[in-house]
């Protein structure tokens, strides 16, 4: 009976101990701070154009739709996607498509450095983004990249020509 009581006390102690929020700063043996994965992903830096080329991948975010991106017999389709694919080919990199729920999610991903380009016609109102590449003058909308990524914005502006639309459509 005494053993059962001791066992129960130990189990309860372990249970309560495991439920406490452990916010201690952890350090490596050589003194650097260990940042939890969730915090380090928040501080991801924007990849420069050179980083994108050396990594061999451009990450585009967009919404699912007939003009943006859709899957047709295991092939990507949609005007925004096809244009971005053309840009990725010009850079000599592959294109990864990340479909987002809404424009807010796309903007967050680009600001956090989780994506390189918003291949979607965004209103040019957010000052933390750089608007570049394919745009529609009548609606004052354009693709966007992180404001810090000037080289990518310039490359997109140098690449896009309105005549491309006729070739893709």
Language-model-detected regions and their locations in the chain:
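Intrinsically disordered, low-complexity regions
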Residues: 32, 66, 114-117, 134-136
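Extracytoplasmic/secreted cell-surface and envelope-processing proteins
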Residues: 70, 106-108, 127-129
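Solvent-exposed coil/turn segments that connect beta secondary-structure elements
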Residues: 63-66, 102-103, 113-115, 122-125, ...
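N-terminal hydrophobic or amphipathic helices and topogenic motifs
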Residues: 2-98, 130, 147-154, 158-169
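Alpha-to-beta junction loops
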Residues: 58, 93-94, 111-120
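Ligand-binding "clamshell"
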Residues: 112, 125-146
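Short helices/loops that flank or line small-molecule/ion binding pockets
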Residues: 90, 99-116
